[in-house]
């Protein structure tokens, strides 16, 4: 049924719907919490700037996929795309960071689910934590739910009416404060940037969408433009959500919040938001923890002997148990996990890497895109390397002045080192060497 619903859309409409439904981020529920330290309007400006860069990056990755004949013939995944265009050695660091990002998403989902459902229902958090662990264990033992892309996208899109209803109730309630904070620090700004970066985790899903849509629209125009439009749609949804929640909440209402924005929002606005928020939490974070826990299990299984694959399910469960220990020690927050992960992993994976892939694909790809399927400007080396350099500069700033503590600075330094190593190894492999016949 879901596949038939998407089949009725134009190729462009299919890409946009799949993109928004699959990519709709869990970090959306942490953005208002992070933004409270700087104020909604400065956070909105950061969101607009990051969203613009991510739009270019998503389109760049889409064009790289369009140019990859091996992907069209045999399929593949994001790591194989990186290996194909940048070289096997250059793919090692991005592969490791992708695993870290996925593990961080499992951790954040566990924290968000257990803390938020406890706040919305009054049932103790430890009870929710135990229930989540059991549910995740059962799913992993069954190999996950094996949700097709169309069904997964429909489930993601089903969260939009819940978001809209909660936003409308928040605006109607009022009493919030959207003015900028007067005394925010550089570290608070850094957390907002990190959480905002984690709104854009499309790398894996663009590959999945390409596999679904390129056979029907092989010129690639729908994939490239739909990826850009989908990213803009995610940015617009995040901006509207931030303003709506800020209409009902003051920054002090979110100070020290461990879970998502939904708990404080329900406290301020009443039972209707509690009911809708519980449904949204289960749908958005529940779907997120299923996807990411299965992904972690498969990543670990790939690195174990075949006889020990069954032990791979322990890895995501261990991440959830780590979340429980950190919560008990009052040492972690939902927004904090995404803030660190966004800086340490996504500035490379979602910003720098797609631009590098585009440069390499224009040099070494074996399929020429159809009319309108080329990313304007960003494929020029000067523009692409400027964006890559901006990502490196941001990581350097996080490693020195924008990070909140030693752990965050080390995480940013690791991300910077991974970016430098990836660029160096890709250059050594000749991925960016000029070829006269390529534009």
Task: Locate the predicted segments by residue.
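Membrane-interface "cap" regions at the ends of multi-pass membrane proteins
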Residues: 1-42, 54-59, 143-146, 193, ...
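Helix-loop-helix junctions that connect adjacent transmembrane segments
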Residues: 3-6, 123-132, 146, 150-266
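Transmembrane alpha-helical segments of multi-pass small-molecule transport proteins
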Residues: 11-22, 94-99, 119-144, 158-166, ...
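Extracellular loop-to-transmembrane helix junctions
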Residues: 32-79, 230, 412-418
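Membrane-water interface regions at transmembrane-helix termini and the short interhelical loops
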Residues: 33, 37, 112-119, 133-155, ...
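Hydrophobic transmembrane alpha-helices that form the core helical bundles
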Residues: 56-127, 274-304, 351
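TM-loop-TM module centered on a large, flexible mid-protein loop between adjacent transmembrane helices
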Residues: 69-88, 231-286, 306, 328, ...
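A generic transmembrane alpha-helix motif of multi-pass inner-membrane proteins
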Residues: 333-363, 371-439
């Amino acid at each position: 049924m879901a596949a038939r619903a998407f089949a009725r859309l134009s190729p462009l409409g299919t890409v946009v719907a799949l993109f928004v439904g699959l990519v709709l981020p869990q970090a959306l529920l942490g953005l208002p919490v992070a933004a409270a330290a700087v104020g909604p309007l400065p956070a909105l400006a950061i969101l607009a700037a990051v969203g613009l860069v991510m739009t270019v990056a998503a389109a760049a990755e889409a064009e790289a996929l369009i140019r990859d004949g091996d992907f069209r013939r045999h399929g593949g995944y994001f790591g194989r795309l990186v290996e194909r265009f940048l070289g096997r050695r250059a793919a090692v660091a991005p592969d490791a960071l992708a695993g870290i990002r996925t593990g961080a998403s499992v951790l954040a989902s566990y924290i968000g689910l257990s803390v938020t459902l406890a706040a919305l229902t009054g049932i103790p958090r430890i009870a929710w934590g135990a229930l989540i662990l059991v549910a995740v264990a059962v799913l992993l033992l069954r190999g996950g739910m094996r949700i097709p892309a169309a069904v997964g996208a429909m489930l993601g899109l089903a969260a939009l009416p819940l978001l809209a209803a909660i936003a409308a109730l928040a605006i109607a309630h009022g009493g919030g404060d959207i003015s900028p904070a007067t005394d925010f620090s550089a570290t608070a700004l850094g957390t907002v940037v990190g959480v905002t970066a984690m709104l854009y985790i499309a790398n894996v899903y663009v590959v999945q969408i390409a596999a679904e849509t390129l056979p029907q629209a092989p010129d690639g125009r729908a994939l490239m433009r739909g990826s850009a439009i989908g990213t803009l749609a995610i940015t617009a949804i995040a901006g509207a959500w931030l303003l709506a929640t800020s209409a009902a909440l003051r920054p002090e209402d979110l100070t020290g919040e461990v879970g998502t924005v939904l708990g404080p929002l329900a406290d301020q606005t009443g039972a209707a938001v509690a009911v809708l928020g519980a449904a949204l939490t289960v749908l958005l974070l529940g779907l997120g923890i299923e996807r990411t826990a299965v992904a972690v299990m498969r990543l670990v299984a790939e690195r174990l002997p075949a006889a020990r694959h069954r032990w791979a399910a322990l890895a995501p469960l261990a991440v959830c148990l780590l979340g429980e220990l950190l919560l008990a020690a009052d040492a972690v927050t939902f927004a904090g996990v995404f803030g660190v992960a966004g800086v340490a992993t996504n500035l490379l994976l979602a910003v720098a890497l797609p631009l590098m892939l585009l440069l390499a694909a224009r040099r070494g790809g074996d399929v020429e895109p159809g009319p309108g399927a080329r990313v304007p400007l960003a494929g020029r080396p000067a523009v692409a390397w400027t964006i890559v350099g901006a990502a490196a500069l941001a990581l350097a700033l996080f490693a020195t002045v924008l990070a909140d503590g030693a752990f965050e600075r080390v995480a940013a330094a690791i991300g910077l080192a991974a970016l430098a190593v990836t660029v160096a190894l890709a250059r050594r492999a000749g991925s960016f060497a000029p070829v006269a016949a390529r534009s």
